[in-house]
Structures are given as structure tokens and as C-alpha cells.
Amino acid sequence: MTLPSGKVMPRTEFEAMVGKEIGVSSWFDITQDRIDTFAGCTKDWQFIHVDPEKAKQSPFGTTIAHGFLTLSMLSAMIYEMPSIEGVKMGVNYGFNKVRFVSPVRVGSKIRARFVLASIEEIRPGEVQTLMNVTIEIEGETKPALVAEWLGRRYF
């Protein structure tokens, strides 16, 4: 499988984007099948995620995506963002903050907006990025989540 990739740019050009939005991902569908598959992986079978009939009685009125499902979608969304020329691999280094602001109802579309907050050299051949990320829900004013995401890139 070939993963989609965003623009590749020289490191100096990427570093010049600190404090700026580097991109917005495409929309991703949140289907009941996606939610059920995630529930199977995590063993989180709470009815608000997997039981459409019972979820109608919840404050959400329907099933909702797991917060961690929404967060995990960042792995797909980041592939659409610009990358640094010469990077051989990148790894998720964790999060400083994550807030689940709004529920993501089944049938919604979500996308991520990425702002490069910082980039620093850890050692020769390794940099750390900090992205301020907002996952938006199509048609909603409040985001699904906001996070400070750390990544390591290796040259």
C-alpha cells in the first residue's frame, strides 16, 4: 500500500513555517463500521459507541466515535501535510495536551488543521516538532478535539 503524502520541502523552508498553519487535511467519514472496528481493537464496547438503538436515549441522540478513535485519525491526516526533505522516518512522540471538546456523531466528517508551533534539533539527524492540532467537524463551530502533538523526524 502506498500512503498519500503532502509536499516535501527543504528544512529551512519548513522551519520558516513555525507559528503558521501548515495545512488542513481532507475530510474523513466517521461511519458506524469504523467505530465498531475501533471498538473491537480497544475492547471499548460502551453503548454510546456501538448500540445505535440504545444511543438514541443518550444525550447525543446517536452513536458517537470514541475520543481515542478521533485522536488516532491524526495518523492518517498527518500524511497529507508537508514534510521535510530528507526525512527517512517519523515517529509519534506523544502529546502535551489533548482535550475532547465535542462529540463526533456517527455520519460526521472530520478533518485536522495543523499549526507548526516549534521545531528543534534533538541531535544531529533528529528533530522534534510540536504541532497544535485542531480536529474539526464539518458543519460544527466547536472542534472535536484540540491537541499539542509531538513528533520526531529522523534524517
Predicted regions and their residues:
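Predominant activation on well-ordered alpha-helical scaffold segments within soluble catalytic domains
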Residues: 36-39, 71-75
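HotDog/MaoC-like acyl-thioester-processing domains
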Residues: 1-16, 103-155
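Hydrophobic beta-strand-centered segment that forms part of the acyl-chain substrate-binding groove
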Residues: 58-62, 72-113
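A solvent-exposed, acidic/Ser-Thr-rich amphipathic alpha-helical stretch
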Residues: 66-70
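A generic structural signal for short beta-strands and their flanking turns/coil linkers
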Residues: 24-26, 34, 87-96, 110, ...
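Catalytic strand-loop segment that frames the active site of acyl-thioester-processing enzymes
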Residues: 2-65
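Generic structural detector for well-ordered beta-strands
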Residues: 23, 27-29, 99, 150-152
